[in-house]
């Protein structure tokens, strides 16, 4: 049926890092996992307007370190760092151990799959035509240096009676190439006709960790016979 494997899951440990990096014994593993989920749920709800792409959680020696990747660091930090201090206290209360919060700025939000998907979803909620929203997102990504991008929307597009899927792509998006740096994410748009799903794949180039790609040899041109002979 041509189903696609999750592009991030298949690349874990190859070109993609984990978003939770810690080690725990069997007795603590479930608690840590549940705690991570609670922290992410809380931060995503609290920072809904801050263009948060991902939240990375690390657990060094009886503490927790949370790195928030956002396109609007000023919104997260707040005036004189007040907001980030409140977040730190809330995270420490949720986990029960001392917390540290770091902010990482995303320089090019147009190349971040999560932010692109959320941008399209918010446009659909504002009744922007889905084709226009898709095309604009694709053109912005290609203009800023993406090697390829594909956007797919599914649901009652334009208020149609029957749900369908439509997609738009520019450049190449090689899903089977494991060394390809492909950023993938999804978002939901809650419209008056129902939920519309948005999927975004962004191809940023190939990760060549000391591996030299095999270059194709230029093909020799056939010799032309001189005229008149």
UniProtKB/Swiss-Prot annotation:
SUPFAM superfamilies: Prokaryotic type KH domain (KH-domain type II), Ribosomal protein S3 C-terminal domain. GO terms for biological process: translation. It comes from the Bacteria. Disulfide bonds: none annotated. GO terms for cellular component: cytosolic small ribosomal subunit. GO terms for molecular function: mRNA binding; rRNA binding; structural constituent of ribosome. PROSITE patterns: KH_TYPE_2, RIBOSOMAL_S3. Residues 39-107 form the KH type-2 domain. Keywords: Ribonucleoprotein, Ribosomal protein, RNA-binding, rRNA-binding. Signal peptide: none annotated. NCBIfam families: rpsC_bact. Belongs to the universal ribosomal protein uS3 family. Binds the lower part of the 30S subunit head. Binds mRNA in the 70S ribosome, positioning it for translation. Part of the 30S ribosomal subunit. Forms a tight complex with proteins S10 and S14. This is Small ribosomal subunit protein uS3.
């Amino acid at each position: 049926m041509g189903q696609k494997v999750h592009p991030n899951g298949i690349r874990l440990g190859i070109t993609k890092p984990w978003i939770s990096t810690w080690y725990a014994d069997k007795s603590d593993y479930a608690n840590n996992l549940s705690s991570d989920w609670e922290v992410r749920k809380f931060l995503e709800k609290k920072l809904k307007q801050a263009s948060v792409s991902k939240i990375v959680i690390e657990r060094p020696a009886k503490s927790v370190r949370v790195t928030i990747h956002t396109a609007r660091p000023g919104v997260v930090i707040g005036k004189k760092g007040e907001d980030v201090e409140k977040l730190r206290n809330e995270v420490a209360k949720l986990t029960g151990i001392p917390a540290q919060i770091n902010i990482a700025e995303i320089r090019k939000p147009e190349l971040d799959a999560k932010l692109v998907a959320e941008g399209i979803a918010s446009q659909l909620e504002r009744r922007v035509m889905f084709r226009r929203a898709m095309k604009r997102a694709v053109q912005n990504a290609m203009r800023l240096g993406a090697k390829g991008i594909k956007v797919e929307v599914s649901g009652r597009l334009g208020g149609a009676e029957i749900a369908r899927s439509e997609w738009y792509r520019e450049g190449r998006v090689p899903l089977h190439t494991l060394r390809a740096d492909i950023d993938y994410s999804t978002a939901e748009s809650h419209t008056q006709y129902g939920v519309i799903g948005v999927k975004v794949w962004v191809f940023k180039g190939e990760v060549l960790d000391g591996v030299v790609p095999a270059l194709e040899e230029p093909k020799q041109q056939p010799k032309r016979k001189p005229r008149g002979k």
